[in-house]
């Protein structure tokens, strides 16, 4: 029998599914906020999120099914116990986060935020022309699961989509062109909407700097749902204050949480949310995380290949 420790929030319906996978699995549940080293010593499988420094206490770990898509903190040498398989939840978050992104863009494009300000004043006032997604050019930087799902939705609304990713793969039919990061600044020049879904690795640190913002149109909308560290916050503030870009939608920031006295809060052309585009805010995403875990638990029991195995050199999944 294998001991499975679930260290993530789950619904009762999720527990029913997990508890009935196989009599070979002894499944227990504990919050990752209170888990102790002694809880981990004889654990064979972990499902959820565990602070990287706690993994050293997992003396017989065979499978770590992370509930996140991002793997920051876990790929350094020695973090994952030797012999353990490490898989992430890539593929779970695209639906929820892409809808958030489209919603944020429409909010600023259609001036919903400004009309909401007028509402308490009972002010019936036409705020003039607005922009449209139809006919726009969208650049998606970080064209993985989340970026692709967002691109599909933007294409459906009539935007021409360009993608940038770490390594070139087969281009989806709906995408105008696919590039690597080497072409970032050139691609920025034509975009009306720039969306970044980049993870927080050293190679993505402050990719969006002064030079990047200077390459953008002054009418561009910038949206970040990846990691705040991919953006030079000072450069972003300068671009917004000088109207070098039209607006920003930020679900992630650097630093995070964003300090209460940070000037981004008071900028009228910025929409800020506290890292809520993913997580368990949309049940369908929560369900998808559990579905990935269930499939991999079954694969483990049958000796089959695990889905979403993380390449420890890149931090990305090697398979689907």
Annotate each language-model stretch with its function.
Residues 6, 47-48, 66, 195-196, ...:
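Redox-cofactor binding/interface segments in oxidoreductases and associated redox assembly factors
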Residues 90, 131-155:
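Glycine-rich adenosine-cofactor-binding loop
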Residues 82-137, 163:
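Phosphate-binding beta-alpha-beta segment of Rossmann-like dinucleotide-binding domains, i.e.
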Residues 168-263:
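Rossmann-like adenosine-cofactor binding region
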Residues 54-60, 77-82, 213-217, 239-243, ...:
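Short, conserved loop/helix-junction motifs that constitute active-site signature segments
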Residues 219, 225-320:
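Rossmann-like dinucleotide-binding domain for NAD(H)/NADP(H)
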Residues 1-87, 209:
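An N-terminal-biased, well-structured beta-alpha scaffold segment characteristic
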């Amino acid at each position: 029998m294998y001991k499975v420790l679930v260290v993530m929030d789950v619904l009762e319906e999720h527990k029913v599914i997990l508890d009935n996978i196989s009599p070979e699995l002894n499944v227990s549940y504990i919050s990752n906020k209170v888990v102790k080293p002694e809880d981990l010593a004889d654990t064979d499988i972990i499902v959820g999120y565990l602070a990287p420094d706690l993994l050293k206490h997992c003396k017989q770990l065979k499978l770590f099914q992370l509930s996140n898509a991002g793997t920051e903190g876990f790929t350094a040498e020695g973090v994952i116990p030797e012999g353990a398989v490490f898989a992430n939840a890539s593929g779970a978050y695209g639906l929820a986060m892409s809808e958030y992104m489209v919603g944020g863009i429409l909010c600023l494009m259609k001036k919903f935020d400004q009309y909401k300000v007028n509402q308490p004043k009972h002010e019936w006032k036409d705020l003039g022309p607005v922009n449209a997604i139809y006919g726009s050019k969208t650049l998606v930087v970080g064209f993985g699961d989340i970026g692709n799902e967002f691109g599909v939705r933007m294409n459906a609304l009539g935007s021409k989509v360009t993608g940038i990713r770490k390594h070139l793969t087969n281009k989806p039919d709906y995408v105008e062109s696919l590039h690597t990061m080497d072409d970032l600044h050139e691609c920025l020049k034509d975009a009306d909407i720039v969306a970044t879904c980049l993870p927080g690795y050293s190679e993505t640190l402050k990719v969006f700097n002064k030079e990047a913002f200077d390459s953008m149109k002054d009418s561009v909308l910038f949206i970040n749902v990846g990691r705040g560290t991919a953006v030079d916050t000072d450069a972003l503030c300068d671009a917004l204050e000088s109207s070098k870009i039209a607006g920003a939608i930020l679900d992630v920031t650097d630093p995070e949480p964003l300090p209460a006295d940070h000037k981004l809060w008071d900028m009228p052309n910025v929409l800020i949310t506290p890292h809520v585009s993913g997580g368990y805010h949309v049940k369908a995403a929560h369900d998808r995380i559990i579905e990935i875990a269930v499939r991999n638990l079954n694969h483990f029991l049958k000796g089959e290949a695990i889905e979403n195995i993380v390449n420890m050199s890149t931090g990305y999944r090697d398979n689907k």
